[in-house]
Amino acid sequence: MKKIEGYVVRRLEDEYLVLPSGRRTEEVNEVISLSETAGFIYMHAERAENVYELTQLVAEEYEIEPAEILEDVRNVVLTLQKKGILL
């Protein structure tokens, strides 16, 4: 999985803010707020080839069975793709 270039991430307590930077600010004027778990998924997306590998990373981090969170991880990935910050 690959993050789209032109964004910076700022962590504020238990949420992540994804902000456009550089030229991206001319195209996008939206700040994307992510929960702690969605932020973890976004920050670690490039370590995974697919949703299944990403689910495994989340499962290890939060000590949850992968089968319990697969659908949730898939939904977060789809949302990040629709927002244009993840391929």
Positions of predicted regions on the chain:
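Acidic, low-complexity/disordered tracts enriched in E/D and polar residues
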Residues: 1-43
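Long, charge-rich, low-complexity alpha-helical segments
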Residues: 30-87
